């Protein structure tokens, strides 16, 4: 969105306010300024008058002009095709430095002296407005010969480009920007004077009638204009339109574009003569379409869809004699819903209507007619035809205390009311300190108290709000369902990190397969199972995982690592949460380190994976028919059995066509991850000792472990089994080696402290009937 200071001056008194302050103010109220740049004609460029023009004898394209600049008459050779006697022009005199760096000097062109240059707008550093030189007129101010061009406001201006968010369609006009600036700078907004109807002219009812359906989603205002000759766009409008890339060849379209950019009101101009016969009444039909948009038509001929596009055949031409001017507004929500159903679209029109154009149609029409009335040989038909549907605006109750609470500091009631009034809000004071607020139609984004607070803060300035810590008072929203979700999510992440892929299966299973695996069936049977294979609720996750692993093995997968987390049911139909794992086949892929001969998965590998997923646990002997009698165990956490682990029985491996396979199933409700309390790390070195102990075959290491833990030796950091050895000489015994690590957190240990602990450990082992090797 491009604005200039001089254009803003049409709506606000900004002569005493610098462009820098305007830019800072715009930024502070949420209208982001992209750039600020000067638009100034060079020095020594003055107003001149072409007194005489003759052809150059030695050139077909050059003319010799006598140009009066007040103090003298200059002879200037000019190559512009549009130069002629009787014109006011911009004259660059000797010594002028042009924007491209060229210095104007006296010169001879084809043997004729030339003492200056007649300039185009492009040569002066402005946008191009026409072919040839720029012709001056009094739209820029009174023309005085010899007056420096940069003393005219339009030629000594500053351009401001702003970036608008999609919800600020109300600022897509000079009037909209000025409205916000008026509130921020406490200025009065200039409104266009209501158009004064001329006497002794025909009324619009003679040539135009509206036929409209009820409940249209829009507002409409029509005026008629009679043209006796083609009109021209004056210099001021041309320069401003060129700055916003809105200058076209059709003068009527140019005036509409100018009025739209100035006021924000959308306009269409229809050529009456191209549709209706002479002396025929022009009846405009307005009908609401399926998606809420309004179709504007004459008989069976489409004129436009409001806010979406205008039919090119209905547009006014250079030779149009009677034109109908339409100012319209359509609810932006309707445009958003309807635009996708129209192949033909006017992007510039949609850009405004989709964000919300200015609904003050009379303001826009008065502004446009104020331009038309200064154009000669033109008749403005009296009166207008309007369709103004009353849209009930929502009422937002507010209080100054509520606004102060949200903002974080007390705000003055009068200041709040003044800000809201300047922004166009309707205020209705009620009892008990409440104020009912109606947001203006041009601000459809204002929905609640928070939006109103944002408007107040925007105008006051966020920098003027004192910083204050926010107090968040909120009850704990962490319930058991959320905690379960986080717990299960973390388990899934750790399983995936260990190389396992998650499987998902139906909660139904094959009862016969479960029975063969040794699992009980639920008491209640399914009356109408979806398939014969899924005829009961599952009591384990393992059967589905075994079937999935078997399918993968048949598809030549060498490493099969799967897990599933889900619900199972006990024999009493109670739902339980379980997680199960399966690792079948090879331990790793073939690679250089294993000489392309990877080993099959081992029990220890599988145990290590489970430890990485659920943490430390203990193993105790078990007896499950589904598992190998030589490689199986129950898993305990804090002396509570939470599941089992082991190798799948060889018979079942063969039945399912599986390679070496290990499985594990755990009760999710029993493996909660408690918060670990961090302890300080000792800076002092550890002392290690090893013991080799003879134990009978079949003796459980857990007995040794439990007895040592019961000693509660303060300096014993950890101990672990590091070796198991047997040979013929040991007969019915194993030799196991246990490594002990001792450390004090406060000091370096002495040997006698460690020896004392080792003696206690040896006595404990003797009490178990064990001897050193």
UniProtKB/Swiss-Prot annotation:
NCBIfam families (alphabetical): pheT_bact, YtpR
Q: Where is the FDX-ACB domain?
A: 682-773
This chain belongs to the protein called Phenylalanine--tRNA ligase beta subunit
tRNA-binding domain ranges (all copies)? 39-150
Q: Give the family, as the similarity comment puts it.
A: Belongs to the phenylalanyl-tRNA synthetase beta subunit family. Type 1 subfamily.
As one GO molecular function, the record gives: ATP binding
The subcellular location is: Cytoplasm
Record's keyword annotation contains Protein biosynthesis: yes
Known catalytic reactions: tRNA(Phe) + L-phenylalanine + ATP = L-phenylalanyl-tRNA(Phe) + AMP + diphosphate + H(+)
What broad taxonomic lineage does this protein's source fall under?
Bacteria, Pseudomonadati, Campylobacterota, Epsilonproteobacteria, Campylobacterales
Entry's Gene Ontology BP terms: phenylalanyl-tRNA aminoacylation
According to the record's subunit comment, the protein's assembly and interactions are:
Tetramer of two alpha and two beta subunits.
* Enzyme class per UniProt: ligase
Q: Which domain of life is it from?
A: Bacteria
């Amino acid at each position: 969105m491009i604005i200039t200071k001089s254009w803003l001056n049409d709506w606000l008194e900004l002569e005493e306010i610098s462009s820098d302050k305007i830019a800072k103010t715009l930024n502070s109220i949420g209208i982001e300024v992209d750039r600020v740049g000067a638009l100034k004609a060079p020095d020594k460029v003055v107003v001149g008058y072409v007194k005489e023009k003759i052809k150059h004898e030695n050139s077909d394209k050059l003319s010799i002009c006598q140009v009066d600049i007040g103090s003298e008459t200059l002879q200037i050779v000019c190559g512009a095709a549009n130069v002629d006697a009787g014109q006011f022009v911009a004259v660059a005199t000797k010594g002028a430095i042009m924007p491209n760096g060229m210095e104007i000097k006296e010169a001879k062109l084809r043997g004729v002296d030339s003492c200056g240059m007649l300039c185009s707008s492009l040569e002066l550093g402005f946008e191009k407005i026409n072919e040839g030189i720029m012709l001056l007129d009094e739209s820029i101010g009174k023309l005085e010969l010899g007056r420096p061009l940069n003393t005219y406001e339009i030629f000594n201006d500053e351009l401001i480009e702003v970036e608008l968010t999609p919800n600020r369609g109300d600022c897509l006009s000079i009037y909209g920007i000025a409205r916000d600036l008026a509130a921020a700078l406490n200025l009065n907004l200039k409104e266009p004077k209501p158009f004064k109807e001329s006497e002794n002219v025909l009324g619009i009812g003679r040539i135009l009638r509206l036929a409209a359906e009820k409940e249209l989603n829009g507002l409409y205002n029509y005026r008629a204009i009679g043209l006796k000759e083609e009109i021209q766009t004056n210099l001021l409008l041309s320069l401003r339109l060129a700055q916003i890339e809105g200058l076209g060849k059709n003068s009527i379209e140019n005036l509409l574009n100018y009025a739209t950019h100035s006021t924000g009101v959308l306009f269409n101009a229809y050529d009456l003569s191209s549709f209706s016969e002479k002396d025929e009444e022009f009846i405009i039909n307005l009908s609401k379409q399926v998606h809420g948009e309004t179709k504007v038509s004459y008989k069976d001929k489409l004129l436009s869809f409001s806010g979406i596009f205008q039919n090119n055949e209905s547009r006014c031409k250079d030779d149009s004699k009677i034109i109908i001017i339409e100012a319209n507004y359509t609810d932006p929500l309707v445009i958003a819903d309807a635009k996708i159903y129209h192949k033909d679209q006017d992007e510039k029109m949609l850009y405004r209507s989709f964000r919300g154009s200015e609904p003050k149609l009379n303001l826009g029409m008065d502004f446009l007619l104020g331009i038309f009335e200064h154009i000669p040989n033109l008749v403005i038909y009296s009166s207008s035809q309007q369709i103004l549907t009353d849209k009930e605006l929502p009422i937002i109750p507010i209080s100054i205390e509520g606004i102060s609470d949200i903002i974080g500091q007390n705000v003055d009631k009068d200041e709040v009311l003044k800000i809201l009034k300047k922004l166009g809000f309707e205020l209705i004071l009620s009892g008990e300190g409440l104020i009912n607020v109606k947001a203006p139609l041009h601000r459809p984004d204002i929905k609640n108290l928070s939006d109103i607070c944002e408007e107040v803060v925007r105008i006051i300035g966020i920098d003027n709000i004192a910083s204050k810590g926010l107090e968040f008072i909120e009850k704990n929203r962490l319930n058991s369902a959320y905690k379960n979700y986080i717990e299960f999510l973390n388990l899934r992440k750790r399983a995936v990190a260990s190389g396992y892929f998650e499987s998902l299966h139906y909660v139904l299973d094959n009862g016969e397969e479960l029975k063969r695996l040794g699992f009980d069936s639920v008491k209640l049977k399914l009356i109408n199972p979806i398939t014969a294979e899924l005829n009961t609720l599952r009591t384990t996750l393992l059967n589905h995982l075994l079937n999935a692993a078997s399918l993968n093995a048949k598809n030549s997968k060498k490493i099969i690592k799967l897990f599933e987390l889900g619900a199972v049911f006990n024999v009493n139909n109670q739902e339980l949460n379980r997680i199960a794992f399966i690792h079948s086949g090879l331990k790793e892929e073939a690679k250089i380190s294993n000489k392309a001969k990877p080993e099959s998965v081992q029990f220890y590998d599988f145990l290590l994976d489970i430890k990485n997923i659920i943490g430390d646990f203990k193993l105790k002997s078990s007896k499950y028919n589904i598992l190998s009698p030589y490689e199986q165990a129950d898993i305990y956490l804090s002396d509570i059995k939470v599941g089992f682990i082991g190798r799948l029985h060889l018979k079942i491996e063969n039945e399912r066509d599986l390679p070496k396979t290990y499985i594990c199933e755990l009760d999710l409700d029993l493996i909660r991850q408690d918060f670990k309390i961090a302890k300080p790390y000792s800076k002092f070195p550890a002392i290690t000792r090893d013991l080799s102990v003879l134990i009978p075959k079949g003796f459980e290491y857990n007995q040794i472990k439990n007895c040592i833990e019961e000693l509660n030796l303060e300096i014993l950091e950890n101990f672990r089994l590091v070796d198991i050895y047997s040979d013929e000489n040991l007969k019915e015994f194993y030799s196991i080696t246990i490594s002990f690590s001792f450390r004090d957190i406060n000091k370096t240990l002495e040997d006698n402290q460690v020896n004392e602990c080792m003696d206690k450990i040896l006595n404990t082992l003797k009490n178990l009937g064990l001897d050193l090797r």
